[in-house]
Amino acid sequence: MTNVPSFSNAKVLVIGDVMLDRFWHGQATRISPEAPVPIVKVSDVDDRPGGAGNVAVNLAALGVATTLSGLVGDDAHAVLLRAAVEEKGVRWSVMPCAAETIVKLRVMSRNQQLIRMDFEGSFSDYVDSSFLQYSRNLIAEHDVILLSDYAKGTLNQVGSLIDACKRRGVPILVDPKGSDFERYRGASIITPNLSEFEAVVG
């Protein structure tokens, strides 16, 4: 089995589904006359890296030299996301494409989530030869690759990325999504959560 270097000494590349987590904070003081829902007066907006971006900033917080790669739209949300990622010390190596950046918007009041709205599509159509070659070039610069899959299409051709890592002898860690773990064949380590593991083993 491939030895995984200590993260404290390794350059780690996170490839996966990058998204923006947006929080609207405010006070819910009354019920709307239009429908039985609270009216929230928004007082603060908080933008954070989500998905693979969250994984990358958590690694950077542990002192790991981290690069983030994936796909985003060529839009204002991508600009905000890049700023939030780089502020945490993560190198931004994310490709823009014609899709819209994924945004997950949560409306919060008194530390309670009232609703979540997802603005997203699939990036599958944009995982082309240029993105795969770009990813292979990044793989050559790093000691460990972490694939962060949220089933949004960025890792639609995950087998190609795993093969590229194996050819270079680079360890591949996978944070999987769904029950088809066969697509991650060749990875050094797969780290499902309990529900994902139970779905696979029955």
Report each predicted region and the residues it spans.
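Peri-catalytic substrate-binding/gating loops that frame the active-site cleft of hydrolases
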Residues: P33-V40
